[in-house]
Amino acid sequence: MTPLLTARGVCRSYGRHAALAPTDLEVRAGEVVALVGPNGAGKSTLVSILAGALAPDDGLVELGVARPRVGWVPQQPAQYGRLTPRENLELFARLERVAEPEAAAERLLRLVDLPDDGRLGAELSLGNQQRLNLAIALLADPDVLLLDEPTSSLDPRQRRRFWELGGEVRDRGGAVVFVTQNLEELERFASRVVVMLDGGVVFDGSIAEYERSPEADVFA
């Protein structure tokens, strides 16, 4: 099966610090890939490069033959603080050339259960900002959903809803790649685990293989 998304030798340094060593990664339809490892391991750098938000120093990211759509939920708020959630969604819908931006915004507000009470993006709680990030990422019905610690500020109910929406992307033939420090999320949702350490991949295998490996101690 042709991968939806492929990274070949991507790397990134900041001055003399190598944040990401040359790294290869293939993401296939139906996969839910967890990126785990200690802080500074290169997880967020890799996801940002996969999303096209950060240029690698070398290497490349290739999309599959069908040119899959990619949605990205960064760790930090990625919306306009002076706009309401509805205004943010309508703006991003127009940028993504989504048909009927107003209707799309209404649908996504309901989908992520985000209050439409007139508050600006900068006035939202961290949890609601994360839900708005997800709504923006889902606007174009992505085939690949990239998530950087997306549920860290969500309560248990919101977290379950978040993963229901991620599961819908997978179930329609897409894939999810997520950075997490949450062992429960890893065990419940991941089909594949990639462990990173010091800017490189030290393990890549199924969740069952991961649970039998020494790299499972990353959560110890």
Regions found by a protein language model. Give the residues of each.
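Conserved H-loop
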Residues: 174-179
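Catalytic Walker B motif of ABC-type/P-loop ATPase nucleotide-binding domains
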Residues: 145-148
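A short, surface-exposed alpha-helical micro-motif characterized by mixed small hydrophobic
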Residues: 186-188
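Helix-to-loop junction immediately C-terminal to a conserved catalytic motif
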Residues: 51
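The feature captures the beta-strand-to-loop junction immediately N-terminal to the Walker
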Residues: 36-38
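Conserved ABC ATPase "signature" region
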Residues: 90, 102-117
